[in-house]
Every structure is written in structure tokens, then in C-alpha cells.
């Protein structure tokens, strides 16, 4: 008999009835819960957002009553803050004119002091001047005049708190007019006086939101706190990569276990920098702000005669090319000798460089693209270090300054060779017309971390450029005198 492969009529009717019941239940659920309506609204909003995404601005897009910066932020449930913070450095230039007493002329926007002559260079690449009597040379480092930080805040709710921190984490509670920074309403505009280079952070709170913004200030005649942090972070990243360890493990290693994490190290650096004082900065702030900059010696301090540990301070100090390094001098005597570099003039003041001069000069090199930020923390490409390689013509020593040779033909300083060079004998070390800021000799400054120690900067020829880059600091007792420490002078136009 042929077997029936279909279903009975009764079974078919039962199946249809069950399906109708299920459809009715599903429709009832959708209607009662308004899922269709929600889906339509979301779909419409999303479609509209996609259509308008190419027109996104600072206001973002609104989906279902909330603002998002991008479609991705909407997908990831990351709405925009209801608080907006804008921070910027402002400045107000004042005219500098040639008065015939302090200033002889203005060349390329730079004041040339009486008793000096313009040699070469532009304002953004290094204007060089020369003493009409001694032939010592100096380079102008520009600084914006009357700098302030302007902070503008807008919120959709009443602002309940504004916290402003300087690069050391110190709270700023006064504005530039020394009035309290008050909190009121949904907007706030404050203007503050920046005190040091580094990161300034503003945190704003309302009843339902909180936002922060950071501004890195590099343009001041002041210490740079944040660059010290960034230099250590560069060391940590390099060590972590080379040793295949975490950055926290690298932070612990380079601090000898004193810091267990990178965050702890950053906090420690801030605390450390609070101990670094430099009273010489305030002495010259008026001149720097009035004239819009300062002069730094083009060369490390030089001497006509080769120096030894018993040389004393009788040699005249020079800022000229191809002189013997003025080494074997302690910090105290460096202050005295640096002050003589105005050659008795009263329209300019000479002084041992301070931390503001050093940090501002390096930041200026970065601003003008003479060096990259990475090259400030690994200065192999522009400094005389053990691991650098370049050609030079002039004086050099291969035995830590005991004996010098002078070459008149281009000579190669090979990698992993240690040469103490005469001043400015290779353009390899020249940036914006300034020589040897990176390597060759450590350079004394007026900065101090304690009552008995003083800071020298820039590294030296026996070290690698990553261990002691241009931004590095080292501490020595003020009476230390070594073959690898020299100094440099700065010039300030008199008020």
C-alpha cells in the first residue's frame, strides 16, 4: 500500500490556530511596550546623525536628548560633557626702541645693545651679536612679553567648583589682579599669572558633571617642571621596551624601588622640583619682560690657555670659537667670572645662566623646530657625547683635557669615542646659532636643590646622549671643580 507522506487536515488546522495565537500575543507585547516606537525614534535619530556627521562641529550631535562628539561616541555610550573649558596663553607686546643709551639699534626685531654689533641671523633662528671690544658673541632668545593664561568656562548647569593647579600641583586661587577667583553662575572667565613652564590643569564641577583640561606652557622665562617629568618618562619607555618589562617595573628599577609605579614617580618628581630654587630668575625678570628676551653666550666659556686643576680663575673668560674649555672651575667662581662678560658696560648685565635661561632656550629650540622634543631627551643627533658621530675642525683632547691637539682639516669623532672639544669647533652641535648646549661639558647654573649643592645642565662627552641629554640636571657641591664642568653667561639689557 502506498504510504501517506502529508499531514492530516485536522493537524493542519491545529497548527494554523496555534500560529495565529502566537502572532496575536507578539503584537500585543510590541504595542503595549512601545518597542516599535522606540526603535523608530532611535533609527530616525541615528539615520539623521549619520546624515549630518560630516557637518559636526564643537557642538557635536544630539541623539535622544544627549549630545555626542561622534557616532562612535554614541555607539559606545560616551556623551559629551556639559562643561566647556578653553585655556590659552595671551601676551601683550610693548614697543622696544633704540634709545641710544641702552639700545643702539633694532635688527630683525631684536634690540642690539650699545657696544655690540649685529653679526648674523634672524629672530626665530638666532640673532648673533658681538662685543665691539672683546669679540665675544651672544645669541638672542625671544620671550613673549606680559604673558597670562586666560581661562574661559561655560556650563549648562550652575558651576559649583573651579580648581586651578600649576605644574607643581599648587592650587591657584588668585587672578592676575590678585583677587579671589570666585564661582558663580554658568560661565566664568579668569586670567591668571603663570609662574613656571609646565602643565596647568583646570577642573570644573557642576551638580551632575565634571570636566578637566590641561594647557602646557613653554614660553615663559622660567623653570620647566613638566619637561623633567617627560624626560624620566622617556627613560622608562626605553627601558621597558629594551628589557621587555612593564613601565611600572621600569619605574621601580630606575628609582631603586622607591617608586613602584609610574604615577608614584611623577608625584615624586613634582615633590623633588619643589626643592629646586633659583633666586637669580627674579633678578632679571624685569629686563626680559621689558625687552622681550635675553642673550645667551654663543659658546661654552672658553679660555686662551689650556686649563688644569691648578689653573685658578686668572684666565679671562671668552665666548668665542675654538678656545680651550674653561673647565676646572667651581660654581661659586663661575658666578664671579660670568659676571665679567659685560666687559664693564653699564647698559647690560652679565650673569651665570639660571634655570630659566636654560629651560627657555631649549623650549625655544623646540618651538622653532631646530630640534624635536625627542631630541631634548636623547641628544645624540646634536651633541658631543660618547655615542655621537660627527666631523670637526679645531682643538680636541682624547685624555680628558690633559693634552690638546689642534686639527686644521676635517676630523671624525667616531661613535663610542670620547673627545673633549674646544668651543664651537663643529656645526654638528649648533642649534639656532648656539653651540654645545648638548654634551661636551656640564654647565653650572644658579639653580639649587639644597643649601650646599648646585645644578649643572646639558650632560658631557664621556656619557651617552640618552643618559645625560640636553634637558638633564645633575647636582654637585658648589665648590666642586672638574675637567668636565664649565659654564656659560647670559646678558640682560639694563632697565
Placement of each model-derived feature along the sequence:
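Short aromatic-cysteine micro-motif
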Residues: 123, 133-135, 225-436
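Surface-exposed, short loops/turns at beta-strand junctions within beta-sandwich domains
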Residues: 192-198
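GGW-centered surface loops in extracellular recognition modules
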Residues: 78-150, 237, 241, 246-248, ...
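Aliphatic-rich helix starts adjacent to a transmembrane/signal segment
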Residues: 29-53
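Disulfide-stabilized, aromatic/cysteine-rich ligand-recognition loop
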Residues: 328-342, 348-349, 353, 428-429, ...
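Conserved structural position at the C-terminal beta-strand
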Residues: 204-206
Amino acid at each position: 500500500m502506498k504510504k501517506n507522506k502529508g499531514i492530516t487536515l485536522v493537524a493542519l488546522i491545529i497548527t494554523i490556530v496555534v500560529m495565529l495565537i502566537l502572532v496575536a500575543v507578539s503584537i500585543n507585547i510590541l504595542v503595549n511596550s512601545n518597542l516599535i516606537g522606540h526603535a523608530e525614534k532611535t533609527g530616525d535619530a541615528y539615520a539623521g546623525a549619520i546624515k549630518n556627521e560630516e557637518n559636526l562641529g564643537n557642538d557635536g550631535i544630539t541623539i535622544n536628548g544627549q549630545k555626542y562628539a561622534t557616532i562612535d561616541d554614541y555607539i559606545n555610550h560616551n556623551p559629551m560633557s556639559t562643561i566647556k573649558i578653553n585655556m590659552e596663553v595671551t601676551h601683550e607686546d610693548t614697543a622696544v626702541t633704540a634709545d641710544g643709551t641702552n639700545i643702539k639699534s633694532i635688527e630683525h626685531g631684536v634690540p642690539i645693545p650699545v657696544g655690540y654689533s649685529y653679526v648674523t641671523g634672524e629672530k626665530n633662528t638666532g640673532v648673533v651679536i658681538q662685543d665691539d671690544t672683546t669679540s665675544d658673541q651672544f645669541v638672542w632668545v625671544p620671550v613673549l612679553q606680559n604673558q597670562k593664561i586666560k581661562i574661559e568656562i561655560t556650563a549648562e548647569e550652575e558651576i559649583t567648583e573651579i580648581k586651578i593647579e600649576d605644574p607643581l600641583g599648587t592650587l591657584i586661587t588668585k587672578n592676575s589682579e590678585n583677587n579671589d577667583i570666585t564661582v558663580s553662575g554658568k560661565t566664568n572667565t579668569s586670567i591668571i599669572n603663570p609662574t613656571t613652564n609646565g602643565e596647568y590643569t583646570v577642573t570644573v564641577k557642576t551638580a551632575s558633571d565634571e570636566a578637566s583640561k590641561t594647557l602646557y606652557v613653554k614660553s615663559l622665562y622660567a623653570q620647566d617642571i613638566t619637561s623633567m617629568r617627560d624626560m624620566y618618562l622617556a627613560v622608562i619607555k626605553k627601558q621597558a621596551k629594551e628589557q621587555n618589562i612593564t613601565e611600572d617595573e621600569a619605574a621601580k628599577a630606575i628609582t631603586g624601588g622607591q617608586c613602584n609605579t609610574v604615577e608614584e614617580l611623577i608625584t615624586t618628581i613634582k615633590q623633588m622640583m619643589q626643592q629646586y630654587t633659583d633666586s637669580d630668575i627674579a633678578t632679571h625678570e624685569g629686563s626680559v619682560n621689558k625687552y622681550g628676551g635675553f642673550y645667551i653666550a654663543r659658546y661654552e666659556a672658553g679660555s686662551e690657555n689650556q686649563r688644569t686643576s691648578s689653573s685658578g680663575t686668572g684666565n679671562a673668560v671668552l665666548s668665542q670659537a675654538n678656545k680651550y674649555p674653561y673647565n676646572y672651575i667651581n660654581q661659586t667662581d663661575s658666578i664671579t667670572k660670568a659676571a665679567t662678560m659685560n666687559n664693564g658696560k653699564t647698559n647690560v648685565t652679565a650673569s651665570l645662566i639660571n634655570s630659566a635661561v636654560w629651560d627657555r632656550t631649549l623650549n625655544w629650540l623646540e618651538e622653532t623646530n631646530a630640534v624635536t622634543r625627542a631630541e631634548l631627551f636623547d641628544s645624540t643627533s646634536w651633541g658631543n657625547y660618547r655615542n655621537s658621530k660627527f666631523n670637526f675642525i679645531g682643538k680636541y683632547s682624547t685624555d680628558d683635557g690633559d693634552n690638546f691637539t689642534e686639527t686644521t682639516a676635517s676630523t671624525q669623532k667616531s661613535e663610542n669615542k670620547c673627545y673633549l672639544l674646544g668651543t664651537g669647533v663643529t656645526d654638528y652641535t649648533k642649534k639656532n646659532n648656539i653651540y654645545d648646549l648638548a654634551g661636551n661639558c656640564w654647565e653650572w647654573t644658579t639653580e639649587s636643590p639644597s643649601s650646599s649643592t648646585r645644578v649643572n645642565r646639558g650632560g658631557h662627552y664621556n656619557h651617552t646622549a640618552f643618559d645625560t641629554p640636553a634637558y638633564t640636571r645633575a647636582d654637585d657641591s658648589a665648590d666642586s671643580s672638574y675637567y668636565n664642568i664649565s659654564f656659560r653667561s647670559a646678558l640682560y639689557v639694563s632697565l
